[in-house]
Amino acid sequence: QADVIHLHWINQGMLSLNDIRKILTSGKPVVWTMHDMWPCTGICHYARECNNYQQECHDCPYIYKGGGRKDLSYRTFRKKQKLYSYAPIHFVTCSHWLKEQAQTSALFEGKSVTNIPNAINTNLFKPMNKKEARAKFMLPEGKKLVLFGSLKITDKRKGVDYLIGACKLLAEK
């Protein structure tokens, strides 16, 4: 029997809002670690420039052909409002930025939000001698190296513009 129920990323059909209601009415304390904005918005994983979630989601600018006053974002926002009233949820974010966004959400009014950054194994991920590192990974010595990783480089949040700018600066030198 669980003492605490700890939710993480529950989207893509893993848990429905009805499933979450069942969890909240179980009588167990619930901690929900947020990995995106979905818990604090109507339907967005990342709200971009939209601040509707701070009052009430509706007329969603990201719904194909535009949303309406009672679009999916509105209906889901209302369902979450009701859902979150069933029992206290302690929300945890993995970044200060996400905590700030969550705290401005009308859905989180009076809710507890804590930031706990993702842990890094500092025994494994630590600085090492540059020459040894380049030799280990067969990288050339005396050359500038640029590393960039992204699942989708067309997503501006991932910083591809900075990569392009850095490459241009390096090419000029």
Regions found by a protein language model. Give the residues of each.
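Conserved donor-binding/catalytic core segment of Leloir-type glycosyltransferases
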Residues: 140-158, 164-168
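Structural motif
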Residues: 3-4, 90, 145
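Short aromatic-enriched loop/helix-cap "lid" or pocket-rim segments at secondary-structure transitions
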Residues: 19, 42-47, 52, 105, ...
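Carbohydrate-associated surface elements
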Residues: 97, 119
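Generic beta-sheet signal
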Residues: 33-34, 94, 116
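Short N-terminal targeting/anchoring amphipathic segment
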Residues: 2-15, 29-35
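A short helix/loop element that forms part of the nucleotide-sugar donor recognition site in Leloir-type
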Residues: 126-139
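Membrane-proximal helix-turn-helix segments that form the acceptor-binding/catalytic region
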Residues: 21-25, 38, 50-91, 106-115
